[in-house]
């Protein structure tokens, strides 16, 4: 990457300070792990996102797109690319009757709270899902019987060629932790959610119940990327880990949670190499004990570079 050329190009597009060089990814991921990214850009509008992605295409620069870093493990060596972070600076929410128009950087928790305040039900399931609406759209995030596809009417995206498109539910092809947008490399900029009117007190009670259940069962007190593996059909990852004797298993500072064996946590001082090795060990042990192949839900960046 020609850093001088790239810096000059970005300086023409954004105010000073909008692009950061050698940005710590450990500060921007929920694992609290990872080396620096060559460049970090946080667009404030959908048009800024479009412009920076177009500039990277023109310069032949590799790009990674992230939200709140809740499903990413960044290599200790960092990332030799531009990271476009769609998060707090692109997180507006507008309510129009029973619809919510949400920018991709809005957190699931904030959207669930706003929906509750407006007396709109349907997004309660996401109140404790770490990450953004953009990530939820790409991965069809779900919890406690609800999924993003259940409430999504359409998603606004940028295609890899830079075209702005609205993807309806049929075209999105949502399934378990999958969407056409993720498959095709679309960048999600926002979504329209169709919710249902309800008493805010009833909505709040449901959200509080889900929060209690999550706190009881999940290791929220330690850095992690949430559920480490996708759920294989017919099995529960936590049960598979328990039966394989993995509760508390460690590699360096990375540990299979004592609380829920479906979670890998940073128990203190873990490196990305520790986490990656631990994930591989879990896969090997579960395959040996149950004949089940676990697919990581966490995205691993920088290891192949």
Residue ranges with predicted function:
Residues 71-72, 112-115, 123-127, 140-147, ...:
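A generic local secondary-structure boundary/capping motif
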Residues 2-133, 143:
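Anion-binding (especially nucleotide phosphate/pyrophosphate-binding) glycine-rich loop
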Residues 20-21, 29-30, 72, 158-305:
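Phosphate/pyrophosphate- and phosphate-bearing ligand-binding catalytic cores of soluble enzymes
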Residues 1, 5, 26, 44-47, ...:
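Conserved active-site and cofactor/substrate-binding residues in soluble primary-metabolism enzymes
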Residues 91-93, 153-157:
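Short polybasic amphipathic segments
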């Amino acid at each position: 990457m020609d850093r001088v050329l790239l810096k000059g190009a970005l300086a023409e597009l954004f105010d000073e300070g909008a692009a950061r060089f050698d940005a710590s990814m450990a500060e921007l991921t929920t694992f609290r792990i990872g080396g620096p990214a060559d460049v970090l850009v946080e667009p404030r509008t959908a048009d800024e996102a479009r412009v920076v992605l177009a500039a990277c295409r023109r310069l032949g620069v590799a790009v990674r797109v992230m939200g709140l870093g809740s499903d990413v493990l960044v290599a200790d060596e960092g990332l030799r690319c531009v990271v476009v972070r769609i998060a707090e600076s692109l997180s507006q929410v507008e309510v129009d009757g029973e619809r919510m128009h949400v920018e991709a950087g809005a957190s699931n928790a904030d959207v669930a709270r706003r929906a509750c305040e407006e007396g709109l039900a349907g997004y309660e399931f996401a109140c404790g899902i770490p990450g953004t609406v953009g990530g939820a759209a790409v991965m069809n995030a779900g919890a406690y019987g609800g999924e993003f596809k259940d409430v999504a009417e359409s998603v606004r995206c940028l295609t890899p060629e830079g075209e702005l498109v609205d993807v309806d539910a049929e075209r999105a092809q949502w399934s378990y932790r999958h969407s056409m947008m993720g498959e095709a490399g679309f960048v999600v900029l926002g979504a329209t959610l169709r919710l249902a009117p309800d008493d805010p007190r009833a909505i709040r009670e449901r959200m509080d119940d889900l929060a209690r259940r999550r706190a009881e069962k999940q290791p929220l007190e330690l850095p992690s990327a949430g559920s480490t593996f996708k759920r294989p059909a017919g099995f529960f990852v936590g049960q598979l880990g328990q039966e394989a004797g993995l509760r508390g298993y460690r590699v360096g500072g990375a540990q299979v949670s004592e609380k829920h064996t479906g979670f890998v946590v940073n128990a203190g001082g873990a490196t990305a190499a520790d986490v990656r090795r631990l994930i591989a060990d879990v896969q090997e042990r579960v395959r040996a004990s149950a004949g089940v192949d676990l697919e990581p839900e966490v995205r691993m960046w920088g290891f192949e570079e």
